[in-house]
């Protein structure tokens, strides 16, 4: 929701100055904030289902800009606090030691304990979905811009290093759908 609203309504507001666009942004931020679970420390990505209690996708890092902006516009710090909490949990649980990222981390919605890192759009649970890696890079970069917390800058830089120095990145620097697709040691899930 964040990158959809910010790319459209925020740009419309910047171009026109029409404050009606700001109300859409703030309503969207309120809707996103309603999906926040304090025990988990993140916003819910998808409805709970048989597979996941509380799924959180790396794509959600793109939503945080909406929350940071709404905090500035409304003066309501809860939006900023939710964004920082979500970024902290993503930093802790989505990034692997090599700074590649899981697409989905499933949490216990009561205790906040991470249950499993996996994929829904990548090749396998232990592979790196290239678009998700890009979402993470953008999200951590933007969170650093908003907070000046160097942990986010380090995560963005290391995740970008993983991306641009990956041995499977084609010479045109345009990655395939997944960095590890069809490789030995990666089994589709």
Task: Label every model-predicted segment.
Residues 1-189:
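Glycan-recognition and catalytic cores of secretory/periplasmic carbohydrate-active enzymes
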């Amino acid at each position: 929701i964040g990158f959809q609203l910010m790319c459209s309504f925020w740009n419309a507001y910047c171009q026109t100055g029409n404050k009606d666009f700001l109300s859409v942004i703030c309503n969207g931020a309120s809707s996103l904030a309603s999906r926040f679970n304090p025990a988990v420390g993140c916003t819910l990505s998808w409805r709970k289902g048989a597979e996941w209690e509380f799924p959180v996708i790396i794509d959600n890092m793109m939503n945080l800009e909406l929350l940071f902006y709404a905090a500035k516009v409304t003066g309501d710090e809860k939006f900023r606090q939710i964004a920082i909490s979500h970024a902290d949990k993503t930093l802790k649980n989505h990034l692997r030691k090599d700074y590649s990222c899981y697409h989905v981390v499933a949490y216990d919605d009561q205790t906040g304990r991470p249950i499993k890192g996996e994929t829904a759009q990548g090749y396998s649970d232990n592979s790196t979905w290239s678009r998700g890696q890009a979402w993470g890079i953008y999200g951590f970069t933007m969170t650093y811009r908003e907070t000046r917390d160097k942990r986010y800058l380090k995560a963005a830089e290391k995740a970008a290093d993983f991306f641009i120095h990956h041995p499977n990145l084609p010479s045109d620097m345009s990655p395939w759908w997944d960095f590890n697709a069809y490789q030995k040691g990666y089994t589709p899930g």
